[in-house]
Amino acid sequence: LEKTQLIERIRDETGWDIPWFVAQATYHVPGDESDPNIRAAQAALWEKGVALEGPDTDQLKGNLRGRNGQGVHFSGPGLHAHAKEWAEKVSPWLVQKTKSVKYKFSFGAIADCQYCRGPNRGSRHYASSAKKLHQCVQELNSHDLEFVIHLGDFIDRDYDSFDKVLPIYQSLKMPAYHALGNHDFDVADKWKAKVPERMGMQGRYYDFKVEGWRFIVLDGNDVSFHAYPKDSLEYQNAGVYYRENKISSPKWNGAVGGKQVAWMRKILETAEAKGEKVILYCHFPVYPADPHNLWNAKEVISILEEFSCVKAYINGHNHKGKYGQKDGIHYLTLKGMVETEDNAYSIISVHQDELKVKGYGRETDRRLLLK
C-alpha cells in the first residue's frame, strides 16, 4: 500500500483535511472489472467524492479501527482499503452497498479421518489422524464458516476410537455434520446400530439449508455388508441386492436404498421449485467411474441430472481424490486425511457463479464454475 502511505504522509505534513479512499486489490478474476455490481459500487463512491481503486470490491467486510477516531480499515479476500475523515460516512455505507451478491458463504470439508490406535499400514497413518484433526479444527475455527462436514470414515475401526476424535471434532465453533462411511461401522455387531447416534447425527441421511442453498447428506451404507450385524435381515438383503444386480464393485462399498432414493428425489423437487441450489454429500463417489463408487451410482447420477438445481456432489472414500464433471454437475472426491504424514482438508467458498476449493495440505485448489 505505497500509495496509501504516500497520501498519509502528504496529509500529515501539509495538514490538509481532504477526504480520500484508496484500495489495493491483490486478487481478482479476469473480467471482474466489467461486473455490473462492481461498476455500480465504484460509480456510487465517486458520487460521494470518494475514489475507489481496485476491482475486487464485492467481498468487503468492514472493521472500525479508529486512529484518533478517524480511521477505518476494510479487509476482504484480496482487498485492503483505508479511509480517513470520511470513515463514519463511508464505512457503514460501503459494507452495505458492496455486500457480495457473488460470494455467499464458506464451509469446511474433511474426508476420511479414519482414526484408530493401530500401527500405520502402508501410507495410512491411523493414529496420527487425531493430531491432524486437531490441527484442522484449529485452522477451521479461525475462519468464518457456516458449517463443517466430515465425509465418512471418521474412524477406521473399534467403537472406542470415537472417544478420541469426537471431542476434537465437537470443539468446532460452527455446526459440524457427518456423512456415514463404511469404516464407521467396523465395530462389534452390538454397536453398529448405535454408530449414528454416537456420532451425534440427526439421522442416517438428512438435509439442511444455508442462504438459498440446499445440502443433502446421503447414506451410502443404506444397503451394505458393513453397516449391519451378520445375522440381521439388512445384511441378508444386501446379499440379495448384490447378487441380483450382478455387482462387481467391492463389498466394502454400498448403495443408496429405494426409500432413501425416493426421499432424495422429493427434496430435489422441492429445491427446484423454490429456486434453491443443491450440493450433495456422501461418503462414496458416483462419478467418474471408479472401483470405489456406489453400487447404484448410475441410478443416482440419472436422478441428479433431472434437476438443474444440482450443482455438485462431494464425497470421500477414495483417498487419492478425484474429480469429474458431467452435464453441468461437479463430482469432487476429497483426499483422505489418514493418508501420509501430511494433512488434507479444504475450505469451500460458495459464490453465485462458482465454488472455490481452497485445499490444505495435500488437497488441491480448484475453481468449479456453476452453470
Where are these regions (language model features)?
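Stable alpha-helical elements in mature extracytoplasmic
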Residues: E2-L6, S34, I38-A41, G78, ...
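Active-site segments of SGNH/GDSL-like serine hydrolases
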Residues: R9-P36, L180, I279-P288
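Loop/turn elements at helix/coil->beta-strand transitions in domains of secreted/extracellular proteins
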Residues: G15-W20, E47-L52, Y103-S106, H143-F147, ...
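Catalytic His-Asp segment of secreted/periplasmic serine-dependent ester chemistry enzymes
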Residues: T26-K97, T333
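Solvent-exposed loop/turn segments at secondary-structure junctions
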Residues: T26-P30, D58-K61, C113-C116, F154-R157, ...
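N-terminal active-site segment of His-dependent metallophosphoesterases
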Residues: T98-D163
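Active-site neighborhood of phospho(di)ester-bond hydrolases with catalytic His/Asp-centered motifs
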Residues: A109-A111, V148-D153, A176-N182, L218, ...
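Extended active-site neighborhood of metal-dependent phosphoesterases/phosphodiesterases
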Residues: D160-K274, E299-C309, Y323-G359, L369
